[in-house]
Curated annotation (Swiss-Prot):
One of its GO terms (biological process) is AMP salvage. CDD domains: ADK (cd01428). PROSITE patterns: ADENYLATE_KINASE (PS00113). This is Adenylate kinase.
Amino acid sequence: FITAAFDIPQISTGDMLRAAIKAGTPLGLEAKKIIDEGGLVRDDIIIGMVKERIAQDDCKNGFLFDGFPRTLAQAEAMVEAGVDLDAVVEIDVPDSVIVDRMSGRRVHLASGRTYHVTYNPPKVEGKDDVTGEDLIQRDDDKEETVKKRLAVYHEQTEVLVDFYSKLEGEHAPK
């Protein structure tokens, strides 16, 4: 809704990383190893990707970050780079709901169609509705990996709520 209303792109570091992984780029291969282990990709890599992305023409009227920044270093780097934000939104969801939602997700790799074993199941269990091909659970959607990522979130990302609430002056969200 927001991207359509303001005619701005949604920028997801996760999507950018998945594209790099699918393309088999050196960054993608490095990122895949880290993500599959439940870790977060290094800040310098993410910040570089984001700076390149927001410099593109379709971002001249603004953009919507999805899942970024994730660390204090990323937030500080964006402030230092002069990237000012109009608003910051935290969606507070209990860990148990996140684990349930993510670990239940199934994907048809060729098309990107996404299902959920409980909330949006395919017509035939484990099969894509259109092609009948197998659905997979991405490694980063496995329960153990999701729990590791949540632990990292609580350690590294929760501090951003305090960071943005205390940010003052021209860089503060309006």
